[in-house]
Amino acid sequence: GGVQQKMLDSVNLISDLGSKKDLQNMIDSAEEKGIAVYLNGITNYAMDSGITDGFFVYTDAAKFVSQESAKLNVYDTVTYEKAEEDRDPFYLLKADLVYEMMDNLADAANGYHAGVSFSDIGYELSSDFYQKDPTSRQMAMEEQAEKLKSLDDNGTDIMINMGNDYAVAYADMVTNMDLEGTEYSIIDKKIPFYQLAIHGYVNYTGEALNLTQNTQNELLNSAEYGAGLAFTFMKESAFELQNTLYTEYFGADYSAWHDEMLEIYTRYNEELG
């Protein structure tokens, strides 16, 4: 778990955050208040955690055209160089392993009577050029949709990221939907065709208001496009993130945002609810 998740061959709680009973109590309490809880995980990728944690590069990672394992790196946004000294590389998983990880996460969520949230399903599609069992992006799309349909048919509540159309039909919630569009085109007006098509069929939000680069624009776009509001919070102070690799969460300090969040939600519900 956490921000550097290992391969999702099993779902274990972080003991510092509480026990299984604590998590179940939280979910039950939320349900009593009409709040849905989703357990989130990454299923397309894995850190090289080693064979003792269930990951073996040569059998579990997808392949490039060169037949090398699909090892991926984070790149520096300023220099465009690999951030090898700061960030550990990670691997794209083979397609059949991705669907196994989806089942593992869904089974864990169902065990707590919670929904399942996929960080990368319905958002990213990848090929696997393994010569003995290649997978095209078209095949991956069809297989992802089939797996999502199976989970949906079994009564599992599903949350996805971004919301590509092949996955939206099976989702109960879409987060981080792009409400802005490309900034590279010179255009006079924007028409939210996608949001017009799905509005009323699935709930969706834009980026977390406290993490986006322009909170006011994201809020106005949410109102215009019929989106819900999203925030990302943590209990600890933002100062805990200083000199770490995760300063993108600097705005996630709950205590710093509490009053403004309530004000935004209250006005949004009163004027648009």
Task: Map each language-model feature to its residues.
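Active-site-proximal substrate-binding groove within the catalytic cores of carbohydrate-active enzymes
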Residues: 43-114, 122-273
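Aromatic- and glycine-enriched glycan-recognition loops and surfaces
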Residues: 1-53, 57, 139-149
